[in-house]
UniProtKB/Swiss-Prot annotation:
This is Protein AF-9 homolog. GO terms for molecular function: histone binding. Its main location: cytoplasm. It is found in: Cytoplasm; Nucleus. The gene is yaf9. InterPro entries: YEAST_sf (IPR038704), YEATS (IPR005033), YEATS_dom (IPR055129). It comes from Schizosaccharomyces pombe (strain 972 / ATCC 24843) (Fission yeast). Component of the SWR1 complex which mediates the ATP-dependent exchange of histone H2A for the H2A variant HZT1 leading to transcriptional regulation of selected genes by chromatin remodeling. Component of the NuA4 histone acetyltransferase complex which is involved in transcriptional activation of selected genes principally by acetylation of nucleosomal histones H4 and H2A. The NuA4 complex is also involved in DNA repair. Yaf9 may also be required for viability in conditions in which the structural integrity of the spindle is compromised.
Amino acid sequence: MAPNTRVSKCQISRPILVGNDAKPLTKEEKEKAPTDHTHTWRIFVEGVDGEDISKWVRKVVFKLHDTYNNPTRTIESPPFEVIETGWGEFDIMVRIFFAPEAHEKALTFYHHLKLHPYGPRMEEMKASGGLVESVQYEEIVFNEPFEYTYKLLSQNPIGDGHGLAVESEPDHPFSQQLEQDEADKLDFAIQEVKKTIEMYKQQVQSLQGQKSSTPVE
């Protein structure tokens, strides 16, 4: 089969991690950073269980906030990451390009840069020096991939077949623990939104009550 021929009725996928970590600047780091910057942070794309994604990822382009010098950063070799300092949170566009031989279109993801502890683990994060980790698990699916992509991914299986680790470790940040933490963060955010909606409802009802009780002259 020719390399530029698609493998029909076939689907092959690869998991990746798109995320960031951040921590407050130390006194020494503050002296070197812009005066308004408060944190050092890292945005990254990496494989699960230490997989070398450079075998099938050609480059990763990170689009930072326009206030940064050279906001479009192109990383063509691992680690696919950008390390910066800053003071605010914002959305980062992450564009992943594959090997030319794969004939696959680039994929775009968006990651919201997190700098400050939040959610159920807020106090734990503060106690650990303010280190924040925000990681998205993404599944890249190749439907009817070209022969080159199919062979490349088939010959380079991922992980050790034991699934996700129970707890996070420095070399393996994505785990059942992190997955649960992300779910807890979502639940926390949903509850906060519900509280806000209820507060506004009460304010509206109060205003309506005041209006109806005001005598008409």
